[in-house]
Amino acid sequence: MNYTESSPLRESTAIGFTPELESIIPVPSNKTTCENWREIHHLVFHVANICFAVGLVIPTTLHLHMIFLRGMLTLGCTLYIVWATLYRCALDIMIWNSVFLGVNILHLSYLLYKKRPVKIEKELSGMYRRLFEPLRVPPDLFRRLTGQFCMIQTLKKGQTYAAEDKTSVDDRLSILLKGKMKVSYRGHFLHNIYPCAFIDSPEFRSTQMHKGEKFQVTIIADDNCRFLCWSRERLTYFLESEPFLYEIFRYLIGKDITNKLYSLNDPTLNDKKAKKLEHQLSLCTQISMLEMRNSIASSSDSDDGLHQFLRGTSSMSSLHVSSPHQRASAKMKPIEEGAEDDDDVFEPASPNTLKVHQLP
């Protein structure tokens, strides 16, 4: 009888009661020791590992990095299954790689679905290329924006979009898609609105601070017009859930207000000139256009301010802004030549003011 098979010490060691006695028990040689290396595996096995290696070294800066990675892993798992089935006859290797293959195929399908070309309506494609694509708004996000709580409406020539002191500014926000509109105040022309421009961006900015206001201008279709119209309330809720798109709208509305300010100062500004001004952003974007439109009438009792504004802008081809340095303070006297003492510039606040002179 073999000693290692009948010894009670061997049985207790196998059970785990006396592991400290293992050092004195002779251990048979390991039959699985790689004394003779087997032959190299089939070429399919090596190609599968090459696919794994290529997928792992793809740089993350590549645009389609994840798609290429999942594609190489899918190919590698497929080759592993072929090798395990035809050349190795290993059921466990085939099963595990089948699971990995399924996971990679699902993830690859999802990535391809996300990268699918999003079809934008032909009528909205011009607006997307002009306004949103330069700001890197994804097509799927633009489609969500234009596919919910908005509609395309039509106005015939001469029809009114907004009436002065009658139409509420809290209902909608619109972008002109086709045609031309003109804006007037008390029957006097102010400026035009061209395609891919907001119709009521000044009112949208003003209603963020004050609710329940009315249009202070009249907007009439000067041609057959089509425009995209959002519900103001639902658009606000949607932008709150999309911070990126919220900032995009702030920028676009600010730029549109700037263009309208240029148009107010130059009524001859046409669509081609307006396009050249799109890149010129200034502090005017922070001014409420509603206040700008109202400022042309300094008093509700007379139209002197309006006529003065119209006379000043009829022949104006560029902006003329008075320098703030030309405004004299009420507490300052004119500085005469040769005045060297700063105390002579300002009037004394009171006759009892004590002057302190520095000793030489």
Swiss-Prot record:
Residues 136-186 are annotated as: Required for interaction with KCNK2. Residues 337-346 have a biased composition (Acidic residues). One of its GO terms (biological process) is cell migration involved in heart development. Expressed in epithelial cells (at protein level). Expressed in fetal and adult heart and skeletal muscle. Residues 317-360 are annotated as: Disordered. Keywords: cAMP, cAMP-binding, Cell adhesion, Cell junction, Cell membrane, Developmental protein, Glycoprotein, Limb-girdle muscular dystrophy, Membrane, Nucleotide-binding, Phosphoprotein, Tight junction, Transmembrane, Transmembrane helix. Changing S201F: In LGMDR25; reduces membrane localization of POPDC1 and POPDC2; decreases by 50% affinity for cAMP; disrupts enhancement of KCKN2 surface expression; increases KCKN2 outward currents; no effect on total protein levels. Its main location: membrane. It is a multi-pass membrane protein. It comes from the Eukaryota. It holds the Pfam family POPDC1-3. InterPro entries: cNMP-bd_dom_sf, POPDC1-3, POPDC1-3_dom, RmlC-like_jellyroll. GO terms for molecular function: cAMP binding; structural molecule activity. Residues 70, 114-360 are cytoplasmic. Residues 1-48, 92 are extracellular. Glycans are attached at N2, N30. It is found in: Lateral cell membrane; Cell junction, Tight junction; Membrane; Cell membrane, Sarcolemma. The chain crosses the membrane at residues 49-69, 71-91, 93-113. The modification Phosphoserine is found at S295, S318. Residues 350-360 have a biased composition (Polar residues). Homodimer. Homodimerization requires the C-terminus cytoplasmic region. Interacts (via the C-terminus cytoplasmic tail) with TJP1. Interacts (via the C-terminus cytoplasmic tail) with ARHGEF25/GEFT (via the DH domain). Interacts (via the C-terminus cytoplasmic tail) with VAMP3. Interacts with KCNK2; the interaction enhances KCNK2 surface expression and is inhibited by cAMP. Interacts with CAV3. Cell adhesion molecule involved in the establishment and/or maintenance of cell integrity. Involved in the formation and regulation of the tight junction (TJ) paracellular permeability barrier in epithelial cells. Plays a role in VAMP3-mediated vesicular transport and recycling of different receptor molecules through its interaction with VAMP3. Plays a role in the regulation of cell shape and movement by modulating the Rho-family GTPase activity through its interaction with ARHGEF25/GEFT. Induces primordial adhesive contact and aggregation of epithelial cells in a Ca(2+)-independent manner. Belongs to the popeye family. This is Popeye domain-containing protein 1. It comes from Homo sapiens.
